[in-house]
Amino acid sequence: MINLIKNINYRDLIGYYYYISDYIPYAIIDNVIKMPNNYYRIYLKDIKNTKYLNYVDLTYEELLSLNNKLLIRKERSEILKERNIKKIVHFTKVENLESIFENGILSVNRLNDSSIAYSPSDLFRLDDKLNMISTSISFPNYKMFYSKRMENPDIDWAVITIDPKLIIHKLDSEFYKTNAASGIYSFDYSPTSNNFLLDMFYDEGRDPNIPKSYPTDPQAEILINNKMPNTYFNSVETRKNISKVKSLTRTAGIDYNPNSHLFSYRSDYKRW
């Protein structure tokens, strides 16, 4: 694992993303110049690297913090590549899709603070993390998803697949190797480091036949803080209400996949 550093060669930052927030890539760092007033001037190009934008001036401490975040993101990207992780997934009711395509996926707290109407997938958040959104790596938590569908047989459901770059950009994502509401975690537990991401693929009890992109425990989850912007959505998968969902995804510019295997269970279900 990486060691965060206390000294940097500031020119090593050239070519990396600059983040206007902790999860939105804003620009590419084009040049860094040390200024006479002990500030560092970062010149930026737009995200497509086609034109110059304004510069920002940072103190050395701010520059160091920026560099360490970039190191974490680089390592996280390497983990996703090594595990061949192509998507994270989130299931919801079809009736929520129109709002989700417009506003992104929002936490319960964000939704309650807004005027957005929604139908919750989980009435009882036992993890009590109402500022977080539950997702899974590569395949839904099929035990929970199945139980929700059985409890609500008249409700149409959808699985949204999401670009895993989201967890590279959002450094406050939390990684749980089993269900966050399992009772083994304290309320103030905050597993945001890359070590916790790796722990989701622990060897003990792992079925050797599941894809390496699957976490060991099918109830493992990633909690995303407050919002998942719709720019990260890759596709939507459903089994019912196909014409409605097709129309919504076409308008939103998102791929649609009917009769998805993501409504099934993992091949290692007998172990769990």
What is each model feature region?
Residues 5, 21, 30, 43-45, ...:
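A structural detector for beta-sheet-dominated domains
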